[in-house]
Amino acid sequence: MLESLELTLCDMQGKLFELSAKENFDSEKFIKAFMNSETAADIDKPFNHMQWAGESYILSRLDEENTPVKGGCIYDDETLYWSGYIYRYWHYYTGESSKNIYKQAPAKLMRSMYLMYHTMSPEMAIDRLKESFLEKKKS
């Protein structure tokens, strides 16, 4: 089980992903840009000032860093929140970097798995996503 601060950061990242839709960012491109960004790498660190920044500040920093694309396909809020939450939880659960997590579970996969996995515990959903990646890697 994660600690309170870690769960708060999972919630913050879920809200950040929701905010990206409100700001009209293409969801797939936004998620890819974020997960591969220096901003996400900073949040991965044990202690970093970005962990205390709000969603709006993080979004503006990411906009300066990677300039995600506006318009395009925008996912629903529930899928975005779940994806953001699970990606951050995954980092705390396994210690993997955001960049490595995204390689295993890109935005399209998270969107397609949302309906099946969103009612599972975060650990179970992550384990299944990792299993799927390893199976795909074998073939």
Q: What is each residue range found by the language model?
A:
Residues 1-95, 108, 115-139:
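C-terminal alpha-helical interaction appendages
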Residues 102-106:
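Small/polar glycine-rich anion-binding or flexible loop at a beta-alpha turn
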Residues 98-99:
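N-terminal leader/targeting and assembly helices and adjacent pre-domain segments
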